[in-house]
Regions:
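N-terminal hydrophobic targeting/anchoring segments and the immediately downstream early-domain regions
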Residues: 1-94
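Second-shell residues forming the walls of enzyme active-site clefts
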Residues: 13, 57-67, 162-325, 335
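Hydrophobic faces of well-ordered beta-strands that scaffold small-molecule active sites
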Residues: 19-26, 45-49, 76-82, 130-134, ...
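Active-site mouth loops of central-metabolism enzymes
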Residues: 20-31, 99-114, 200-213, 273-281
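Short, acidic/polar
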Residues: 27-40, 111-122, 212-219, 281-289
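Glycine-rich, aromatic-flanked loop segments that form ligand/cofactor-binding clefts
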Residues: 67-96, 116-142, 164-189
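Surface-exposed, active-site-proximal loop segments in enzymatic domains
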Residues: 91-104, 144-156, 198-199
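Flexible, glycine/charged-enriched surface loops at secondary-structure junctions
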Residues: 321-328, 342-344
Length: 344
């Protein structure tokens, strides 16, 4: 951790520190003025692109506006999904179409790194800083395409933990070469569930993965390659923390990631805004539950939840331990921004 990150975080007000914990979704129909006003007035950590951006001029206008706002001297992160195949938000001229991870796994890891580096440089030139990729989760061979979140949509590298790790590490290396922040996902893996947590609240329990499971090797290899961020799954893991969604589990984020793995990077939530798996929880408290369990950066597809999330996060900072957690999480976000010249 850069000591400067802690120094900056401590100088912010509680509300500003809370804002630096939230990334909001942006769709092509949003106006740059609306989004930059949200970032500026709420000191938000940044944005992530949603939907299909096919008009380069419209995309450039949005990213130019966002990259010129700087609340408290801290620039926003611009993130996007760019796994390949079906999952890539940016589809404009000048950005190569990336094959799905399933297709990438038919190449050599060295070739994958080269392909990813080229695409990541194109994204960086547009003003993108962070990519929600790679998907490091290992697919249960007994499920195959019945695994809807990964296998059905060709999002995985396969069923072998070591090979998945090799390819995940290659993607991370490609991002790093281009100066892009990798977000390895969805820890501790969603290859052993049948339903997609974005659309279902049933069929999202992994009853096999354990705390020291061999399927976790792929994540460790991605971390060793330098993945600066990790996204937490919104599934249940009955052999790790029964009854608690992954992104609200201190056993997964604090005990496993920070403890077992010694991971010091940025811990990012899966979507807390529109995912069906979290609908039963008040919108604002989704962020505070995530952060209290050890998370750093909460993402919401619904930008209108930013205000309630800031209020909920601020309310948890009344105790000494709550304030320390808020400062610590904001410091992790700012630490990544310092490394990518998004603040000084």
């Amino acid at each position: 951790m850069n000591p400067r990150a802690v120094e900056i975080a401590k100088k912010l007000s509680p509300e500003q520190r809370a804002g630096q914990r939230i990334l909001v979704g942006v769709v092509p129909s949003d106006s740059p003025e609306y989004i930059t006003n949200l970032i500026d007035t709420q000191c938000l950590a940044g944005i992530f692109l949603l939907g299909h951006w096919t008009n380069r001029s419209k995309l450039e206008a949005m990213l130019s506006a966002v990259n010129h706002v700087s609340p408290q001297g801290i620039k926003p992160i611009v993130a996007t999904d760019h796994e390949g195949g079906e999952i890539q938000n940016i589809r404009v001229p000048g950005v190569d179409h990336l094959p799905s991870q399933e297709a990438l796994a038919r190449m050599s890891p060295a070739k994958v790194q080269a392909v990813v580096t080229t695409g990541a440089r194109q994204l960086a030139k547009l003003g993108v800083h962070m990519v929600f990729s790679p998907v490091a989760g290992v697919i249960d061979p007994r499920l195959g395409v019945r695994n809807k979140p990964i296998a059905k949509h060709h999002r995985g590298f396969g069923t072998d933990p070591h090979l998945c790790g090799q390819y995940s590490a290659a993607v991370v290396a490609g991002h790093r070469k281009a100066g892009i922040i990798s977000t390895t996902k969805h820890f501790p893996g969603i290859g052993r569930i049948t339903e997609d947590t974005d659309f279902k609240s049933a069929g999202i329990t992994d009853d096999k993965t354990t705390r020291h499971d061999r399927y976790l090797e792929s994540f460790r290899m991605a971390f060793d390659a330098g993945s600066e961020a990790v996204m937490i799954a919104s599934a249940y893991y009955s052999k790790i923390d029964p009854g608690t969604l992954g992104l609200f589990s201190s056993k997964i984020m604090t005990d496993m990631l920070r403890g077992d793995f010694g991971y010091q990077g940025l811990i990012v939530s899966d979507d807390l805004g529109s995912s069906v798996s979290v609908f039963s929880i008040d919108g604002g408290h989704r962020a505070s539950k995530f952060v209290s369990a050890g998370g750093d950066l909460a993402i919401t597809a619904d930008p209108l939840l930013a205000g309630p999330m800031i209020r909920a996060l601020t309310s948890t900072a009344t105790s000494a331990s709550g304030k320390k957690r808020l400062v610590d999480a904001a410091s992790h976000v700012i630490n990544v921004k310092l490394a990518h010249s998004l603040t000084k």
